Amino acid sequence: FVYGTLTCSVGMVVINFALDLSLTLGASVALATTLVGVLSACNGLGRIVCGILYDTTNCRTTMLFVTLVTTGSALSILLALQTGSLLLGVLGMCLAGISYGSVPTLSSAFLIGFYGIRDFATNYSVANLRGLIGSFVPTIAGFLLQSSGTYVTPFLLLLGISIISIPLNFMIRRP
């Protein structure tokens, strides 16, 4: 649950910032709007990739993949902000979309794999509370952006969240 909440919150922040972040990195309004759509498409792609990876490997490998993609997103955007590279920003947004899209697929596969189909609807409903809890992170990130005047500060927060999720991959045990 904590893992899903952390990973989900990174995606929520990037989705929230995507348009203005693209403009900050030099995209035209038309391109920035298109990039928000690309991020959304990557969300859908993440669901498929995560499902295939889970079915062909295992839970831990899939979680590690999602964690690396999430961390790569924060790092790419931080590098984009430092260098002014729109291309790195686009990469980071695409990775965030893939990561964010992976969470629902990973959650449902994880729940069935660990707890079976019995009470799946209840378990999945509880797992989806990650969106409620994670929704506070964009508010915090927005406050950090406003108080610091730069996107670097909120993306350092996202990098920290991503790094915190790494050891969670190794702490999860079948009940």
Please give the residue ranges for each predicted region:
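A membrane-interface helix-boundary motif in multi-pass transporters
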Residues: 143-161
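Extracytoplasmic gate region of multi-pass secondary transporters
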Residues: 1-50, 137-141
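Helix-to-loop junctions at the C-terminal end of transmembrane segments
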Residues: 47-58, 145-146
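C-terminal ends and interior cores of transmembrane alpha-helices
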Residues: 69-82
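A late C-terminal transmembrane helix in Major Facilitator Superfamily
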Residues: 114-148
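Intracellular juxtamembrane helix-capping segments at the cytosolic ends
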Residues: 102-115
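Multi-pass alpha-helical transporter architecture, strongest
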Residues: 159-175
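Cytoplasmic membrane-interface "Motif A"-like loop-to-helix N-cap segments
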Residues: 55-68
